[in-house]
Amino acid sequence: MERPMARSLEGRRAFSHRKSYKGQKHTVIGAISIDGLVCIKAIKDSMKGENFETFVSKNLCPKLSKGKVVVMDNLKIHKSEKVQQMITDTGAKPLYLPRYSPDFNPIEMLWSVLKSFIRRFKPQTSFAMQQVLRIFLLVLNKSFFKNWFAKCYYCTS
């Protein structure tokens, strides 16, 4: 989030080359498919293992079924036995990408577009951040997801 005020000499406009103020931290976690957004959740802090496990059990697993594949990077919390077990219990299969391979992960493109969308609107409060996220979700359409999967070398037909 952006700082709402700044200091300067009287009669002079405040100017800064680089933002040095860090606002409140927000973390967004989600899952996508070629058909669109599967689930998404915003957290007002850093992601912790228990937050991810809760997301998987309450948001992701109810939408999984036999034959689905959950593609994740090699983040430690993604590879926990509890998360793997929750996913396999639904009949889905967890699949882990090689290290340092965001080019094969379509959700990285979603995060990139979301970050630029947030930078453009510059929300200054948590409420404004939630509103920007809601608007972003309304703007997304199925063609975005299909193109992101195609760009990551997944079969889209």
Annotate the PLM regions.
Residues 1-17, 83-98, 117:
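A short alpha/beta connector and helix-capping loop motif
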Residues 1-57:
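Extended, low-complexity cationic-aromatic segments
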Residues 33, 64-65, 141:
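Short conserved AdoMet
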Residues 33-37, 76-78, 100-103, 154:
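Short, solvent-exposed loop/turn segments at secondary-structure junctions
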Residues 51-69:
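Short, basic/hydrophobic alpha-helical segments
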Residues 56-59, 87, 134, 139:
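A generic "structured core" feature
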Residues 72-74, 81, 95-119, 127:
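RNase H-like two-metal-ion nuclease catalytic core shared by retroviral integrases
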Residues 107-157:
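C-terminal anion-handling pockets and recognition modules
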